[in-house]
Swiss-Prot record:
GO terms for cellular component: cytosol. Pfam families: Ppnp. It comes from the Bacteria. This is Pyrimidine/purine nucleoside phosphorylase. GO terms for molecular function: guanosine phosphorylase activity; purine-nucleoside phosphorylase activity; thymidine phosphorylase activity; uridine phosphorylase activity. The gene is ppnP. The lineage of its organism: Bacteria, Pseudomonadati, Pseudomonadota, Gammaproteobacteria, Alteromonadales.
């Protein structure tokens, strides 16, 4: 199990889509921010305010990246990068976890 050291964790969860996507914000010792979340089965559209690297921690996601028309499968331990100010969609048929690193 990969562990983070010397972090601050927000007490309150970020809850989206009526509780079907829930994440926690973490601030690392260097001041950078990440969120760790759980996604229940379904399809969801998100928007970015800044660049992001999304890593699949467990489960799998199909992702419709900005400007694309075909879904791309991302399995556990894979990742994809998003530019600032874009929208993208995620769908999954199982409980899945992710880490979002802001860049």
């Amino acid at each position: 199990m990969s562990m983070l050291q010397q972090v601050s964790v927000a007490k309150k969860a970020n809850v989206y889509f009526n509780g079907k996507v829930i994440s926690r914000s973490v601030v690392l010792a260097d001041g950078s921010k990440q969120t760790f979340g759980v996604v229940l089965p379904g399809e969801y559209e998100f928007s970015t305010a800044q660049g992001e690297i999304m890593q699949v921690i467990s489960g799998k996601f199909d992702v419709l990246l900005p400007g694309k028309t075909e879904w791309v499968a991302y399995a556990e331990a894979s990742q994809f990068e998003l530019a600032p100010n874009v929208s993208f969609s995620i769908r999954t048929d199982q409980i899945s976890e992710y880490c979002c690193q802001y860049i």
